[in-house]
């Protein structure tokens, strides 16, 4: 699906992001005008696509390239009681209408759809990679901010608004000004028990939730190179939490091995040609980034959030901060507000914070590697008295893979709920929600006020910390078990 242009043989020293951008410019903007960028793949779901389809109808336009669109049902679908994928299995009327509308739109406009009940259904940012639709060097968009997940493959992937979704439907292009580039250089190697989730939370705490605004982040260094694709997807997924437009990791053999043989991946001679192009994508030696940030990966320990934005995080071994710990007045005010909402007392050890619900799910951390990590910790244990643990695989495919490995039994034997695929408790948009005042340890990506339900309090954690927390009942790491 990539569309490199003739100037891809340029000798100019370029970053990964600059190469992908260059190879997709249909027309170059002049006098400060945006470039017109070709889009290789648009992903769709039931929440942000209905208005775009309606826009096509009202203007009498056709979907320019149905084959470059891929849809699934994820945001509003229930994660229990789903057996056939029938609309009757959705109790909420609005959710049922949204899913029904997506099905009708995809049928009318010829878009490939993976609905509930289909083994290939799941969260849109898991479905693309598992099908091989997500490939290095592509431009990928979706009406969802966590489209940045796909940047783990060396693609430029970013979320867009509904009007832009319609623009891509009609033209397969977007007018955009080039993004700035930022290198996140991770030195050293991650210690055992420290994951990509801990790393990305530490990065966001370091640069802030606005530190990446206007940038494409490229994650670099030996620690990144040694990560699996599942771990890399976690890194890129949360780039938006640092304010970035996208996050990217250069493709390598790990990437190629993941993509090869998947349903929508190139085959035969096309595969060889694709890999040859993909190998040209990594940032050139001597290329210049607009900004460089360094972080010592070897010094990291399990990392969690204590507040109400992903940048309010600390190592698990620390204590709840005081507003007086912050020198910036805005940070001080934000800390005061967050502590009040989270009902936390400064000086309280983070490990003493009692948790009501553990959520292992979302497009951030519910792939097979995440489930395996959590299951290995839970095996032979029971979750704490009064604890609720929900395990929601990010796709039906992954659910079946986990069941073949016996992971579902480990979770249910421990007392956890084993659910069907969907966005679930990541966002308070479906039946899976916290009650007011309840506190969760969640492997998702956002801890805003009310994100998991009105009045709910969210701590972002890794799958390992989630599992350990479920056992002990307070925020914990596997070392505490």
Swiss-Prot record:
Catalytic activity: (2R,3S)-3-isopropylmalate = (2S)-2-isopropylmalate
Uppermost EC category: lyase
Quaternary context: Heterodimer of LeuC and LeuD.
Gene giving rise to this polypeptide: leuC
Positions that bind [4Fe-4S] cluster: 363, 423, 426
Swiss-Prot/TrEMBL cofactor(s): [4Fe-4S] cluster
Protein name: 3-isopropylmalate dehydratase large subunit
Keyword annotations: 4Fe-4S, Amino-acid biosynthesis, Branched-chain amino acid biosynthesis, Iron, Iron-sulfur, Leucine biosynthesis, Lyase, Metal-binding
Function: Catalyzes the isomerization between 2-isopropylmalate and 3-isopropylmalate, via the formation of 2-isopropylmaleate.
Family membership: Belongs to the aconitase/IPM isomerase family. LeuC type 1 subfamily.
HAMAP family hit by this protein: LeuC_type1
GO molecular function list: 3-isopropylmalate dehydratase activity; 4 iron, 4 sulfur cluster binding; metal ion binding
Region annotated Disordered, chain positions: 432-459
An example Gene Ontology biological process: L-leucine biosynthetic process
PANTHER family cross-referenced by the UniProt entry: 3-ISOPROPYLMALATE DEHYDRATASE, HOMOACONITASE, MITOCHONDRIAL-RELATED
CDD domains reported in the protein's UniProt record: IPMI
UniProt cofactor note: Binds 1 [4Fe-4S] cluster per subunit.
Assigned EC number: 4.2.1.33
Induction field: Repressed by RipA.
Pathway: Amino-acid biosynthesis; L-leucine biosynthesis; L-leucine from 3-methyl-2-oxobutanoate: step 2/4
